């Protein structure tokens, strides 16, 4: 348990999820420009590449001996990737598109320490209610949708618009815990060890 864990993220949600499992870690923002990677049609490849670049950016800040954890999450609907909205209007349009439908939330994780890298992806299916059009902008303004891929957040008002979730709810929060623990075990670490 002597390895320093670094969560390469500025996401308060990812930080809160990991803190719940009592494992000691520090947060370091990767400062990687996500817009430098172009989506080529494969959301798994896209999120893995983004997560790998985030981990590499953290490693280059002097954390190569640490175990770096990075993630990238996207919403996918009918082959289109929804990242974080660029404006309130963009967030409203995303929610309008997703209203009354089902979509996928895909998170790719990368764990990196020195030259060793492990990665995996998780998919969760989310179904929305038919969101009343007059409430779209209200939701966006009430729940800081500009910081959330797809323009929504499961723990902030998600209960108003989410009809059903199939799969890992932590995945929607950007840090699928079961998958993370499986990857940590490749580095001889288990979240179970910190819960005792």
UniProtKB/Swiss-Prot annotation:
A GO-annotated cellular component: cytoplasm
Organism the protein comes from: Chlamydia muridarum (strain MoPn / Nigg)
Key words, A-Z: Cytoplasm, Hydrolase, Nucleotide metabolism
Catalytic activity annotation: a ribonucleoside 5'-triphosphate + H2O = a ribonucleoside 5'-phosphate + diphosphate + H(+); a 2'-deoxyribonucleoside 5'-triphosphate + H2O = a 2'-deoxyribonucleoside 5'-phosphate + diphosphate + H(+)
InterPro entries: ITPase-like_fam, Maf-like
Active site residues per record: 72 (proton acceptor)
The protein, known as: Nucleoside triphosphate pyrophosphatase
Source organism phylogeny: Bacteria, Pseudomonadati, Chlamydiota, Chlamydiia, Chlamydiales
One biological process term in Gene Ontology: nucleotide metabolic process
């Amino acid at each position: 348990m002597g390895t320093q864990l670094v969560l390469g993220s500025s996401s308060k949600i990812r930080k809160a999820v990991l803190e719940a499992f009592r494992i000691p870690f520090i947060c370091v923002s990767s400062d990687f420009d996500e817009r430098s990677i172009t989506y080529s049609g494969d959301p798994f490849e896209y999120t893995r590449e983004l997560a790998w670049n985030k981990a590499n950016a953290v490693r280059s800040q002097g954390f190569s001996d640490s175990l770096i954890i990075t993630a990238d999450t996207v919403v996918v609907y009918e082959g289109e990737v929804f990242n974080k909205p660029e404006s309130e209007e963009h967030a409203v349009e995303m929610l309008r598109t997703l209203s009354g439908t089902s979509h996928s939330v895909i998170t790719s994780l990368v764990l990196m320490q020195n030259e060793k890298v492990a990665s995996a992806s998780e998919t969760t299916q989310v179904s929305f209610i038919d969101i009343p059009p007059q409430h779209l902008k209200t939701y966006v303004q009430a729940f800081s949708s500009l910081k959330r891929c797809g323009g929504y957040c499961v723990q902030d008002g998600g209960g108003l618009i989410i009809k059903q979730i199939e799969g890992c709810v932590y995945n929607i929060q950007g840090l699928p815990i079961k998958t993370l623990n499986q990857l940590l075990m490749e580095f001889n670490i288990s979240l179970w060890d910190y819960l005792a």
